[in-house]
Regions:
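N-terminal loops that bind phosphate or other acidic moieties
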Residues: 1-372
Length: 372
């Protein structure tokens, strides 16, 4: 994996931004999350008053477990989804258009051939990752290719002038790889993020099944905090090799590269969340550059895992719209929250600008000014 350097947030810009926010014509702290988002972007961009951000969307396509017993569709559902992106008819693309956000759709590893889809960026490494019950999800060489490609896309989107990128995925059977990646990094027990399904094996049977596969690969880490920086990186890369898959590996590198360019990243589901966890474990400073977005209404699989991912990261999703389609829709809608925070920061007037009185008591006293 290539080397990179991520810098901390620029504190003087954040302090100046916070002072302006506290002096906007509203009760102090009343816009809550919008305020903290704007303040963080000031630190990311080293600008006390960021505005007119340039947005983008990156959708990565890859199937999982193609040689596993659950593969009955053989990529047909994924192909249908990617075909809609090729035609430009998805909800994600509609939402992105409202923010003038360019949408990149990259095929890393769908099981079916997409060479005939002219609007899909063809970067196929292999046609789907393995079932780790058979062999590691991807080879070491495939892992390196996915990582380098992720960094290359971060370089490319930065060169295009983007400042915030919403990430998402298209692909079948990503649940198991996301589950194992999440549990290994957060240290939670499988029973805490598996939900009973009356139509299949019990939770206990599923846990035993997973352990029978993953235990032989030695991916468990007793205490991540006890590892050195290089040991953490190597442990994460081994995890991605065994149970990550092409999309999670690519997105991990993209997130690291984006943060090194001071680009923010918005994530949504368990696949993008797993990549965030991997990137944050490799370099904890990544956490300052990532933002949650939506909760998907999928209580059996996605919801418990995503909840654990957000708990570990110390964040809460902003949007609760009972969405069933992911495909970067949640993260793209998350861009609208960031856009709203920029409008708050730049379009609202301060007490001085509006020539109105400030708070005479309470939290705003002494913090708000009505004259120079």
């Amino acid at each position: 994996m290539r080397t990179f350097k991520i810098e901390p947030l620029h504190v003087p810009s954040m302090e100046a931004c916070r002072l302006r926010i506290d002096n906007l014509t509203k009760p102090i702290y009343s816009l809550a999350t919008l305020e903290s988002i704007a303040e963080r972007f000031a630190g990311i961009l080293r600008n006390p008053k960021p505005n007119h951000l340039r947005y983008g969307v990156l959708v990565v396509a890859a199937d999982h477990l193609v040689d596993g017993p659950q593969n009955t569709e053989h990529g047909s559902e994924s192909y249908d989804a990617i075909e809609r992106f090729n035609e430009g008819t998805t909800a994600t693309q509609g939402a992105a258009a409202k923010l003038n956000a360019v949408v990149h759709v990259v095929n890393l590893g769908l099981e079916q051939d997409t060479a005939d889809l002219a609007n899909i960026e063809q970067q196929v490494i292999r046609k789907g990752s393995h079932f780790f019950g058979v062999e590691p999800a991807i080879s070491r060489e495939e892992l390196e290719r996915a990582l380098e490609l992720g960094f290359a896309y971060a370089d490319r989107l930065h060169a295009d002038g983007l400042q915030v990128v919403a990430i998402g995925n298209v692909g079948e059977r990503a649940f198991l790889d996301s589950l194992v990646t999440t549990a290994t990094i957060t240290g939670c027990a499988y029973e805490d993020i598996l939900v009973h399904n009356e139509y299949g094996p019990t939770v206990e049977q599923r846990i035993a099944h997973i352990h029978s596969f993953v235990d032989r690969f030695n991916i468990d880490v007793d205490d991540w905090s006890a590892l050195s920086e290089s040991e953490r990186r190597d442990a994460v890369l081994n995890l991605l090799h065994v149970a990550g898959g092409l999309d999670i590996a690519f997105l991990t590198a993209f997130i690291l590269g984006a943060a090194s360019h001071r680009m923010a990243v918005v994530f949504d589901n368990v696949v993008t969340g797993a990549a965030i966890l991997a990137a944050v474990t490799i370099d904890p400073l990544v956490k300052d550059y990532v933002f949650p977005s939506a909760v998907y209404d999928e209580p059996i699989h996605d919801e418990p895992i995503h909840k654990e991912q957000c708990r570990f990261l110390g964040v809460k999703p902003y949007l609760h719209y009972s969405l069933l389609i992911d495909e970067a829709l949640g993260s793209t809608m998350g861009l609208s929250i960031i856009d709203a925070s920029m409008h708050m920061l730049n379009d609202m007037k301060t007490f001085i600008e509006a020539e109105v009185s400030v708070a005479e008591d309470g939290a705003g006293k002494g913090r708000q000014k009505d004259k120079e």
